[in-house]
Amino acid sequence: AAAPTIAAKSENNANDKVEGDASNLKLTGNAWALFPRLGYQNRIEFTVKTAGKRDKFGVSLVRGTDADVFYSLVVNDEGEETRKINFEQQGTAGIGFLANGDSYVFQRPADNTYHIVITTDNSICTMYINDVCCYTNRIYGIQRNCWSINSYSGSVEVTGLTVASK
């Protein structure tokens, strides 16, 4: 497994920032860092530390800089102490939250640190968070497209990013 290079990053406005590289990344506001295409079988692993209790972040798959639609696993705050993974269709032609596509609620880590492991096998994607949440869904086209780590609000630090692909 190796740390990927950042292929592109958001440059929306002065409040949305991407700082650092893939080994030590900081996303602020509504920002994203795009990474190269994935293989057919992948293991993505990283740690996210949020600055506040309500900061929101996620991972998008089947994404490119010009994608009209892509799919995101969003770690959404359901309250100050609870989180849930929402499955969303994002992009200029996306419809947002996909009903009945979310996870069970889990407790926000006391230290705001989320250890994330994502495995994909062709179109099956499974996301694990801190050994307390597991979410699986089918997403077509993972292996032909880029992916990103996103901040939707607040400030998130990403460390220890590795990707292993077959």
Q: What residue ranges belong to the model's regions?
A:
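Beta-rich accessory regions
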Residues: 1-166
